[in-house]
Amino acid sequence: MNFIVEALNEVRKRKPLVHNITNFVVMNTTANALLALGASPVMAHAEEELEEMIGLADAVVINIGTLDSWWRKSMIKAVEIANEMKKPIVLDPVGAGATKLRTKVALEILDRGVTVLKGNFGEISSLLGEFGKTRGVDSSEYDEEKAKVLALSAAKEFNTTVAVTGAVDYVSDGGKVFAIYNGHKLLERVTGTGCIVTAITGAFVAVTEPLRAAISSLVVFGIAAEKAYEEAKYPGSFHVKLYDWLYRIDGEVIRKYAKVREVGV
């Protein structure tokens, strides 16, 4: 998968500035992950400075994890400004389906247009009004066969690239569907790991087209998780090793460990 290596090299060369409107739980986590990868993070939420900040940024990441009425206004305005400036937008609809507010706000953002939509099975299902359920921010009914159909259906419905995460991750642009098999089960025991994927997708989509960006972020992060587990078997030390491997991962490691293929639906 040479395009993944090329995308990573381009991130490290260009150091894209990723503007995150994200949740309180993961601000530090995702900022450090972006830095480890080679990108530059900024966490700015004030509505009054959005136009200036987005003007400086190479991509915008919207994560609704700690949503409230004030953040809702900033998020929607940020998406509108980013679209006007033709800046790529990544949306993580954290907890969509758990409450009406989260689902409504995610759909409001999608109506305005995003470049990549990344969420778990329950979140993406709820946005389509289909078969998933969401408990908190976790998906409770992942099904591999349904997940790949869901990725394709959501990509067509929302006219965007969609990444559905789970035991196997599926990415679709509404035409092709790819399965990514990298990752580790211990990720479930560390908060914010899905949000890291969203943030680094922002870095990748700043340097390559959306389908390749979504695949690259999932493969790179999945390999980093696998390598981290080789060195740390418990959640705390594993979390630290994730940063180390986002920094250490290179073309040789990607070519050796990437597990991604196009699949039929």
Swiss-Prot record:
Its EC number is 2.7.1.50. Its cofactor is Mg(2+). It is an enzyme of class 2 (transferase). It comes from the Archaea. Pfam families: HK. Keywords: ATP-binding, Kinase, Magnesium, Metal-binding, Nucleotide-binding, Thiamine biosynthesis, Transferase. InterPro entries: Hyethyz_kinase, Ribokinase-like. Pathway: Cofactor biosynthesis; thiamine diphosphate biosynthesis; 4-methyl-5-(2-phosphoethyl)-thiazole from 5-(2-hydroxyethyl)-4-methylthiazole: step 1/1. SUPFAM superfamilies: Ribokinase-like (SSF53613). It catalyses: 5-(2-hydroxyethyl)-4-methylthiazole + ATP = 4-methyl-5-(2-phosphooxyethyl)-thiazole + ADP + H(+). Substrate binds at M43, G192. GO terms for molecular function: ATP binding; hydroxyethylthiazole kinase activity; magnesium ion binding. ATP binds at K118, T165. One of its GO terms (biological process) is thiamine biosynthetic process. Catalyzes the phosphorylation of the hydroxyl group of 4-methyl-5-beta-hydroxyethylthiazole (THZ). Belongs to the Thz kinase family. This is Hydroxyethylthiazole kinase. It comes from Pyrococcus abyssi (strain GE5 / Orsay).
